[in-house]
Amino acid sequence: MKKRVLSSLVAGVLAIGVLAGCGSNNAEDTTAENNQANASVTETENAGDADNSTVESKGTITVAASATPHAEILEAAKSILADEGWDLQVTVFNDYVQPNEVVESGEFDANYFQHIPYLESFNEEKGTHLVNAGGIHYEPFGIYPGTKTDLADLAEGDVIAVPNDTTNEARALLLLQDNGVIKLKDGVGLEATVNDIEENPYGVEIEELEAAQVSRVAGEVAFVVLNGNYALEAGYSVSKDAIAYETADSEAAKTYVNVIAVKEGNENSEGIQALVQALKSDEIQKFINDTYDGAVIPFTE
């Protein structure tokens, strides 16, 4: 398989977001000690709605979140919770260690930024006791056109660019398998690498690149396989431009659903249950679908 090394430096929240919210299961990829000094924390305004002044107050729910799409979705849910007597307070964190630490310590009730593999890996490495209180959304991988626009036009020697980190590469390879481009060894699942390709009927080459670089070679390769965040950044519309993308019933979607995480024992508390129900409401599902054009999809199970 062909592998191109790119020297471009990648910075910004999106690069980390793919690891924590959209595809990495290695908590070691973030370092608590380094991020404590550099993380910028911005607290959004509390929801204060005069129309809800007659609603009996049930208390405050504090949530640590990443900015996009998590905090945006939470902001949309504030009025729903306010109507039920809950004051939802959202604080945006720019790293992916502190949101777990502040929930573990009890400073915050919940966080919303990560998928289950990252949560489990963080618990194992840091000795925390965080659990999934409810899956809210997933960010699908999609196959996007490069120099070709139809998978049926694939020819021997065509190159398909995929992310090179373990979990994101596995998702890309599984999506290619689901669409008949390759066949993987049985049972490799979300640990698949290019070495697990058992059949390659089109004779394509898989080019492994850092996730943030994949979209940048679209003009040089037949197809690119991208996470939803990177697709948005590159100007793609998931619903309009993706040739194929992960469906809600796919193994990847169920595994990498972004969740509300809480300290063990708090998952059934009244406030957390109200929060999860609000985020899974028809109103919030519509908000997600209308706002993110397929790059973020409500998880309904």
Q: Can you annotate each of these PLM segments?
A:
Residues 1-26:
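Sec-dependent N-terminal signal peptides of Gram-positive bacterial secreted proteins and lipoproteins
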Residues 45, 67-89:
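Short, polar/charged alpha-helical segment
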Residues 140-151, 256-269:
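A bilobed periplasmic-binding-protein/Venus flytrap-type ligand-binding module shared by bacterial periplasmic
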Residues 90-101, 189-216:
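Short helix-initiation/N-cap motifs at beta->coil->alpha
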Residues 133-182, 285:
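A conserved helix-loop-strand patch within extracytoplasmic ligand-binding domains
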Residues 121-133, 146-148, 220, 225, ...:
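Ligand-binding "clamshell"
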Residues 56-68, 86-92, 158-160:
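Short, well-ordered beta-strand elements
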Residues 18-50:
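Bacterial lipoprotein signal-peptidase II cleavage site
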